[in-house]
Curated annotation (Swiss-Prot):
InterPro entries assigned to the protein according to its UniProt record, in alphabetical order: A_thaliana_F-box, F-box-assoc_dom_typ1, F-box-assoc_interact_dom, F-box-like_dom_sf, F-box_dom
Alphabetical list of PANTHER family matching this protein: F-BOX ASSOCIATED UBIQUITINATION EFFECTOR FAMILY PROTEIN-RELATED, OS09G0372900 PROTEIN-RELATED
Name of the protein in question: Probable F-box protein At3g44130
Span of domain F-box: 1-46
Gene source species: Arabidopsis thaliana (Mouse-ear cress)
Superkingdom of origin: Eukaryota
Length: 313
């Protein structure tokens, strides 16, 4: 039977929809397929089609947790151990961050590893003379054609006379390993205490205003090096001081999802954004509380049943 060649465009469309693990194994088929891994458009589209997975880091091993057959009658959870080429002690690292499919891991007072889980490539950034630098998150200047990753963090400043600790925020450029300090009077209010999430090169985090008792999303733009409040969060003002527990993540590749749990009632809700940062217009910039809307909720009794089922698994 005669065989024919598919158009390159059709091959790209098929390959970008394959699972990343299978796609890596196809690099050796031909030079053109291997070149896809250096094509920014192909990488972006492939990551956009990929099903999100969890990465867990127990002690010295790394695992990925994915779902198989969610659309069928017999969905399964797949747990895979991922090979890593670096060794660490669990107590020596503090933070992790993801950006463009890369995993950044901070080793306290030592440096940061940049790890591509699927290509099994590991890079190391050493802090050298800046060992007191505290890692927060990763981003890049979205206005430039080439992505130069930058680490957002801070240095502790100690005041001996009053025994107070202050933070001085800075940007650590991965390529040049240069540190640039950022001074702003808004930092005490805008600095978040939770995890920082990277989206379109910018950083976002949940923060809290002690004076107004309002939760909101803070943001940092690596292009302008300006921090600002992105939107208010629909959280109750608790006079008791017990704040809602918040977990922020990226949803559908271009917007946010927020898991919110009340520390009083233990009710858990999932909120999703109708639009992403790029889609914000002058019309909806003022409608801050409409930024995130409820997607679903989970009562404490159902959450307890879910925990028990997870323990059995």
């Amino acid at each position: 039977m005669a065989s024919g060649n598919l158009p390159w465009e059709l091959e790209e469309e098929i390959l970008c929809r394959l699972p990343l693990g299978s796609l890596v194994r196809l690099r050796s088929v031909c030079k053109h397929w291997n070149d896809f891994f250096n094509d920014k458009w192909f990488i972006k589209k492939s990551l956009g089609c990929a099903r999100p997975q969890f990465i867990i880091l127990p002690e010295s091993k790394i695992y990925s947790i994915g779902t198989i057959g969610l659309d069928g009658v017999d969905p399964k959870i797949e747990v895979r151990e991922l090979a890593c080429q670096f060794h660490f002690e669990a107590e020596k690292w503090a933070f992790t961050a993801a950006c463009d499919g890369l995993l950044f891991r901070d080793f306290w007072n030592q440096g940061v590893t940049i790890w591509n889980p699927w290509l099994r490539q590991v890079g190391w950034i050493e802090y050298k003379e800046n060992r007191d630098f505290r890692f927060c998150g990763v981003g890049y200047d979205a206005g430039k054609p080439e992505k130069g990753y930058k680490i957002f963090g801070y240095f502790n400043r100690f005041y001996d006379t009053k025994l107070k600790i202050d933070h001085r925020f800075a940007i650590f450029e991965c390529a040049s390993q240069a540190v640039k300090f950022i001074d702003s009077p808004e930092w005490p209010m805008l600095a978040g205490r939770g995890e920082y999430v990277s989206l379109n090169g910018n950083l976002y985090w949940t923060a809290y205003n002690e004076e107004t008792r309002e939760h909101f999303l803070g943001s940092f733009n690596f292009s302008t090096e300006i921090s600002m409040r992105f939107c208010l969060l629909p959280c109750a003002k608790h006079v008791s001081g017990l704040r809602d527990k918040l977990v922020l993540t990226v949803f559908k590749g271009d917007r946010f999802a927020l898991l919110k749990q009340s520390r009083i009632s233990k009710d858990t809700k999932v909120l999703t954004a109708q639009y992403g940062p790029k889609a914000r217009t002058k019309k909806n910039e003022n409608a801050e509380k409409a930024c995130l809307k409820s997607y679903g909720s989970l009562k404490p009794d159902r959450l307890e049943k879910l925990k028990k089922s997870m323990k059995r698994y």
